[in-house]
Amino acid sequence: MFFRFPEDARWNADGQAVEFGVGIGEYEGVVRVPRQVFGRFIDGAVTPERCLEAYHLHRTRLERVVERKLRNRQLTDDGNVEVNGRDLRVLPRGASMAYSDFATR
């Protein structure tokens, strides 16, 4: 399976979230990462600009979470993907605690 993540990250003011596209095969969807999720990456005020900056700094990690959610068919009612704080705490299969400690810093 090849996932596609176009370079289209943007701030959604109505949803207070960073959104970006994802595709696999014929599926095309939108990933939403709410503002409060970025609080773990940002010291100080969690502004839209800083959320987008944090997205780019942690893009690979967020994309891996999205891949896992799509493989497990964890979609929202509208067929898209929403990443929450719990998704970022889940250990990948076979990962050690040392990896977990490193990944959350």
Report each predicted region and the residues it spans.
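Intrinsically disordered, low-complexity regions enriched in Ser/Pro/Gly/Gln/His and often acidic
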Residues: 2-4, 34, 48
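Short, charged/polar N-terminal "headpieces" of proteins
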Residues: 1-27
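Compositionally biased, intrinsically disordered low-complexity regions enriched in proline and serine
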Residues: 4-6, 28, 39, 56, ...
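Acidic, low-complexity intrinsically disordered segments
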Residues: 46-105
